[in-house]
Structures are given as C-alpha cells and as structure tokens.
C-alpha cells in the first residue's frame, strides 16, 4: 500500500502527520481569509433568506451591518445596499427601510424624535455614506435604555428644532444637518446642507443658529466646516462631493452653474463648474442622465462640441470616479495647463449674468 511506504519515514513522522491533520480543518470548514471575496451585495432590499441564497452567512451579515455596508429594517426583514449613489433607486429603497425602522423604534420609545439620517430622509434630503442603525433623539434628562436595532441620542430638543414630516415628528432640517455633520462627518453634512439651501428648506441664518445651539457638543468642528462649506448652487450630491475634493486638493474654486454663451451671444449651456481663468469646464455626470432613445446623449455631444469650438476644455467624471478622485484631479490640472487664458484670441466664450442667486 502507498500508506505502508510512507510509514518507512518513522513513527515520529506519522505522529506529526496525524497531529497536523487534527489541527487543520478540512477546506470546507476553514475560516475564510479577510481578503477572500465576499458575496455580492443585494441589488434591492431582501430578507435574510434571500441574503443566504446569495451566499451571506450570519457572521458575514453581522460584519456588514457593523460596517454599514448593508442596513437592517429590524427583525431581520429588510437588507439592502448602503453604498449606492444618492438618489439612485437602490439608495432610496434603503433610505425608506431606514426611515421605517426608525418609525418602528419610535413607537417603542414614546419620547423619542426621529433624527439624523432618518430625519433627512423624511424631509427629502439626500444621504451619503453608510446607513446602519436608525437614529432617534430623546430630550436631555431622559434615562437611556437599550433599544434593539436603534441608536438613541440624548440631547436638548427645543420646539424650534422639531417639525412634522410625512406624519412623523422629526428634527428640523437645520438641526438635522448639524446632527448629521457631527455624527457622520463633513461629507454627509455638506451634501445635506447644499440640497437644503438649494431647495429653500433652510437659510444660512437657520444653519448658523443650529450651529450655535450645538457649538459645545461633540463633533462641533465638523458642524462648523459644514456651515462654512455649504453652497446652495450645487444641484446634485455628486457636485457637492466634487467641490469638496477640489478644495481638499487645493484647486482654485470654480464658478458653479455658469451660464456660458459664444462670443456672438449664442447661449451654449449652464455648466456644473467653470474655471474661467483657465478655460476649463467641469461636468459631474450623475445617475440616469441619458434616456433610452439616446437623444440626451446626442445633445450632450453637441453641447460639448460647441464648448470646444468656443475654446473651452471639457472634463467629465461620474460617481465611480469618487472612489479614487486623483485621476480626475490630474486631468483637471492638465487641462488648466493647456487651457486658454484671458486675453487670448482663442477665447470665444462669455458668461451670462446669473438670473438666480443661491443662498
């Protein structure tokens, strides 16, 4: 037998082999390495059975929930994408699940007010980043108790910070923005603030008052940066996040929503970003921009051709580029170096005066 031939190496070798076999579990039972590929995230909210069918174990789900990659609607009912682009159908489904979970938790905690991301969803503001447990706020002095599936915050809740939205008692938009900035960081705070300013949900005065009220609370630095960075000219979360990338990289501040015309006065387009001193246009292309018939795509190509004939360089990017924005920044820097400077005869464009001033 083959086994008999292996025994010739001596009893000690056989003993080591048996010991090694006992210590090493069979391949099917080995713990997966951290670098092992994880099952695909669900394309829509599903229950735990559906997640199991995709290859998710209970342990993997616990880790994903803790990391904010998926969100639970409570009682193991709903799971969904947490990292989808703001405004996308997947993201909206997850946001609705988060709001429903907050509502369910609020029923079990009568003094609680829906706050943070769930309050943003209730008032229509976009969210970015991981969506994990729903957040509720209770008045200062309330004894906190463990509430399964929810994150309770104890804080001052004056009447001016409370509104009703979709039938729920939630924190006001200005208070919600400051809470999000303090809890989830500047990126999430600025995206919500830009939208709220653009849509008239808040004024700069509202944001300033909300900041002053929480100026001594944890996270106040993020809240202050959010207040100073917010710009109601942004028309999408992608524009908000792109603007923050420009600032972090030290790029000159662009002119947002510039109305560009040809030198003869023909209207061309309103650009997302214009660096007029360099002759560069930046276009942040969001989700579902092109219709099935392709007509929008044709118009985009025609507009780009007009901009280029006027002497402008067009740089475009999308949501996927946010994962690593360095290549976009490099393309912009290259365009700045090649662009048409003021006074050049190649400069064949002008800027129309804005008809709408954003707060």
Model regions and ranges:
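Short gly/ser-rich loop at a beta-strand->alpha-helix junction or flexible surface loop bordering the NTP-binding
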Residues: 1-219, 337-359
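Surface segments flanking catalytic/ligand-binding clefts of nucleic-acid enzymes
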Residues: 10, 16, 20-31, 39-42, ...
């Amino acid at each position: 037998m083959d086994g008999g031939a292996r025994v010739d190496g001596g009893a000690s070798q056989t003993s080591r082999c048996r010991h090694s076999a006992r210590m090493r579990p069979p391949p099917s039972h080995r713990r997966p390495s951290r670098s092992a590929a994880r099952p695909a995230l669900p394309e829509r909210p599903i229950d735990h059975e559906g997640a199991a069918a995709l290859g998710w174990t209970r342990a993997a789900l616990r880790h994903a929930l803790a990391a904010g990659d998926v969100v639970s609607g409570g009682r193991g009912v709903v799971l969904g994408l947490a990292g989808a682009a703001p405004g996308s159908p997947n993201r909206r489904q997850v946001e609705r699940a988060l709001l429903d979970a907050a509502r369910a938790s609020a029923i079990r905690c009568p003094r609680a007010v829906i706050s943070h991301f769930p309050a943003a969803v209730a008032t229509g503001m976009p969210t970015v980043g991981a969506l994990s447990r729903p957040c509720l706020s209770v008045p200062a002095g309330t004894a906190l108790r463990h509430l399964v599936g929810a994150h309770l915050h104890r804080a001052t809740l004056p009447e001016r910070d409370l509104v009703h939205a979709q039938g729920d008692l939630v924190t006001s938009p200005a208070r919600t923005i400051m809470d999000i900035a303090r809890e989830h960081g500047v990126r999430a705070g600025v995206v919500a603030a830009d939208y709220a300013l653009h849509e008239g949900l808040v004024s700069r005065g509202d944001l300033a008052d909300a900041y002053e009220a929480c100026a001594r609370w944890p996270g106040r630095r993020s809240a202050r940066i959010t207040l100073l960075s917010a710009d109601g000219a942004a028309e999408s979360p992608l524009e908000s996040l792109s603007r923050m990338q420009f600032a972090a990289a030290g790029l000159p501040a662009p002119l947002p929503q510039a109305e560009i015309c040809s030198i003869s006065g023909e209207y061309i387009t309103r650009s997302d970003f214009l660096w007029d001193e360099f002759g560069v246009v930046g276009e942040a292309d969001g989700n579902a921009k092109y219709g099935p018939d392709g007509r929008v795509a044709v118009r985009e190509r025609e507009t780009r051709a007009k901009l280029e004939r006027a002497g402008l360089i067009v740089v475009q990017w999308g949501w996927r580029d946010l994962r690593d924005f360095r290549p976009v920044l490099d393309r912009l820097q290259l365009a700045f170096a090649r662009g048409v400077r003021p006074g050049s005869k190649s400069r064949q464009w002008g800027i129309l005066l804005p008809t709408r001033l954003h707060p």
